[in-house]
Regions:
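Non-catalytic nucleic-acid-binding interfaces of large nucleic-acid enzymes and RNP effectors
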Residues: 1-27
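Short, well-ordered loop/turn elements at secondary-structure boundaries
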Residues: 31-35, 150-151, 158-159
Length: 179
């Protein structure tokens, strides 16, 4: 689904990903061909995509945890909330205001920002990267789904993840990494 420029923004949407899964665990308890499913997701994907696509850099295995350790803020949810907002906002003030709604104080914000600059000096915050990242995620998920189709594996997209029968979860991990 594209709101504007199809080369820089857009997201893949399906009915499956709209099934409830927070309060009523419908989606994760759905069966594919009578089998339980596994959801395999990209970890810290917007950060990873920007570093890989724009700078040919690897974010490492645990970027949120690394940022938390470098900032002294060892709450993964706070780090994730900061990254999501800082990468999605068009400017620093908008990101800071959005972070406040997540309980991230100005002091925490500055510590997280400094940790990002130290660990990932090429990472660009406050440039509205979310739309491009979602577009890239959609392209990757489309490749994974088509590969599944070629191999007879049902593969359903869920935002930045895929749902597959549990017996194919290692296939999904491998295929997502190659895509």
């Amino acid at each position: 689904l594209y709101k504007g420029d199809p080369f820089s923004e857009g997201r893949l949407y399906t009915s499956f990903q709209n099934l409830p899964d927070r309060l009523a665990r419908v989606r994760i308890n759905t069966l594919i061909d009578g089998e339980p499913i596994a959801e395999i997701d990209f970890n810290a994907n917007h950060l990873r995509l920007q570093l890989a696509v724009l700078h040919q850099q690897d974010a490492g295995h645990t970027p949120y945890e690394d940022i938390g350790a470098a900032s002294g803020i060892n709450d993964r949810q706070s780090v994730k909330a900061f990254i999501t907002r800082a990468m999605g906002a068009d400017n620093r003030d908008a990101a800071m205001n959005s972070c406040k709604t997540e309980g991230i104080t100005n002091v925490m914000f500055e510590a997280l920002e400094a940790a990002c600059a130290k660990l990932y000096p090429d990472l660009k915050l406050f440039i509205g990267w979310t739309h491009q990242a979602q577009n890239l995620e959609g392209q990757i998920l489309k490749k994974v789904m088509l590969q599944g189709l070629d191999e007879g594996i049902v593969c359903l997209p869920v935002h930045d993840a895929v749902a597959v029968p549990k017996r194919h979860q290692f296939w999904a991990v491998k295929t997502m990494m190659r895509a």
